[in-house]
From Swiss-Prot:
Main location: cytoplasm
Outcome reported for the amino acid change (mutating residue 87 to D): Abolishes RNA-binding but not homodimerization
Reported tissue expression: Expressed predominantly in testis with lower levels in ovary. In testis, it is expressed in pachytene spermatocytes and at lower level in type-B spermatogonia, preleptotene and zygotene spermatocytes. In ovary, it is expressed in maturing follicles. In embryonic and prepuberal ovary, it is expressed in the oocyte and follicular cells.
Role summary: RNA-binding protein, which is essential for gametogenesis in both males and females. Plays a central role during spermatogenesis. Acts by binding to the 3'-UTR of mRNA, specifically recognizing GUU triplets, and thereby regulating the translation of key transcripts.
Lineage of source species: Eukaryota, Metazoa, Chordata, Craniata, Vertebrata
Domain RRM: start-end pairs: 40-115
GO MF annotation list: identical protein binding; mRNA 3'-UTR binding; translation activator activity
Provenance organism: Mus musculus (Mouse)
UniProt keyword list: Cytoplasm, Developmental protein, Differentiation, Oogenesis, Phosphoprotein, RNA-binding, Spermatogenesis, Translation regulation
Protein name: Deleted in azoospermia-like
Residue(s) carrying Phosphotyrosine: 276
Length: 298
C-alpha cells in the first residue's frame, strides 16, 4: 500500500514538471511562447471555417469530459482558425498534443494553452496641444543702469512759417482763416535736442547764414493805388550823384523778400492780395468814369 501511494505523488510531480517544461520546448515543430500554462486546456489550431464548436466538442470527448470549447473570431464574427478546448478532469495534455489528429481531412495543430503574462501598460491620456505664442518683445527706452538716461522722442514741431501764414481777414470781427489756395515752400529748421535737467550735453550748432533784408515800403490802404512796382534802395550808391532807384517788379521783390526774410512773407503776400482787389476796384471805377465822360462828350 505504501509503495502504491508513493508512486502516485511521484507521477503527479513528474507530469507537472513535464507540463511546465513544455513552455521552453517545441510542440510539433513550433516554438511555444513564454507564459503560464493553463491546466487541462489544449490549444487547437488549423480549424476550418466550416467547423463549429459542437463538432469540436464531440471530437475531443474521447480524451475526457469537455468543459468548454472556444473558437476565436474577429470583430465581424469570422473564425480566425484557432481556439481552445478545456476539460473538467485531469487529462494528459502532452499525450493529446503528441497525437496526430486529422479532422475533416485537415491536420490540426495542437499544443498546450499558454496564457501570456500581462505586462503593465500605462494608459497615457493625450492632452490637448495648447500653443502659447511668445509675448511680444518689450522695448524699454530707459536703461537699467543707475545713471539712467531717458531718451524721449522730440514732439512734432509745426513749421513756424506755415504756422503763422494766415489769410488777411476781410472784417476785423471775422475769425482767422488759413490760406488753402496758395502752396508755399516749406522751410526746415533744426532744433537742438532736449536733455534732462541737471545734465550737460554738447552739440554742434550749424553756422549762421547772413540774411539780407530788402525793405519794401508799406502800402497805406487809404492812399491811391500805385503802379505795380516799388523801389528798392541799394546798400551803397552806384555813383556820386546820390542813391539811385531801381524799378523792380513787385511780384519778384515779394518772392526775394520772403526767401531771405520769412517774417515779411505774410505781410508782403497779404498786401499784394489786398492791393490786387483794391486795384481791381479802382481800375473799374476809373473805367466807369471814363465811359461817363465819353458819353457826356458825345
Amino acid at each position: 500500500m505504501s509503495a502504491t501511494t508513493s508512486e502516485a505523488p511521484n507521477s503527479a510531480v513528474s507530469r507537472e514538471a513535464s507540463t511546465q517544461s513544455s513552455s521552453a520546448t517545441t510542440s510539433q515543430g513550433y516554438v511555444l511562447p513564454e507564459g503560464k500554462i493553463m491546466p487541462n486546456t489544449v490549444f487547437v489550431g488549423g480549424i476550418d471555417v466550416r467547423m463549429d464548436e459542437t463538432e469540436i466538442r464531440s471530437f475531443f470527448a474521447r480524451y475526457g469530459s469537455v468543459k468548454e470549447v472556444k473558437i476565436i473570431t474577429d470583430r465581424t464574427g469570422v473564425s480566425k482558425g484557432y481556439g481552445f478546448v478545456s476539460f473538467y478532469n485531469d487529462v494528459d495534455v502532452q499525450k493529446i498534443v503528441e497525437s496526430q489528429i486529422n479532422f475533416h481531412g485537415k491536420k490540426l495543430k495542437l499544443g498546450p494553452a499558454i496564457r501570456k503574462q500581462n505586462l503593465c501598460t500605462y494608459h497615457v491620456q493625450p492632452r490637448p496641444l495648447i500653443f502659447n505664442p511668445p509675448p511680444p518683445p518689450q522695448f524699454q527706452s530707459v536703461w537699467s543702469s543707475p545713471n539712467a538716461e531717458t531718451y524721449m522722442q522730440p514732439p512734432t514741431m509745426m513749421n513756424p512759417i506755415t504756422q503763422y501764414v494766415q489769410a488777411y481777414p476781410p472784417y476785423p470781427s471775422s475769425p482767422v482763416q488759413v490760406i488753402t489756395g496758395y502752396q508755399l515752400p516749406v522751410y526746415n529748421y533744426q532744433m537742438p535736442p532736449q536733455w534732462p535737467a541737471g545734465e550737460q550735453r554738447s552739440y554742434v550748432i550749424p553756422p549762421a547764414y547772413t540774411t539780407v533784408n530788402y525793405h519794401c515800403s508799406e502800402v497805406d490802404p487809404g492812399a491811391d493805388i500805385l503802379p505795380n512796382e516799388c523801389s528798392v534802395h541799394d546798400a551803397a550808391p552806384a555813383s556820386g550823384n546820390g542813391p539811385q532807384k531801381k524799378s523792380v517788379d513787385r511780384s519778384i521783390q515779394t518772392v526775394v523778400s520772403c526767401l531771405f526774410n520769412p517774417e515779411n512773407r505774410l505781410r508782403n503776400s497779404l498786401v499784394t492780395q489786398d492791393d490786387y482787389f483794391k486795384d481791381k476796384r479802382v481800375h473799374h471805377f476809373r473805367r466807369s468814369r471814363a465811359v461817363l465822360k465819353s458819353d457826356h462828350l458825345c
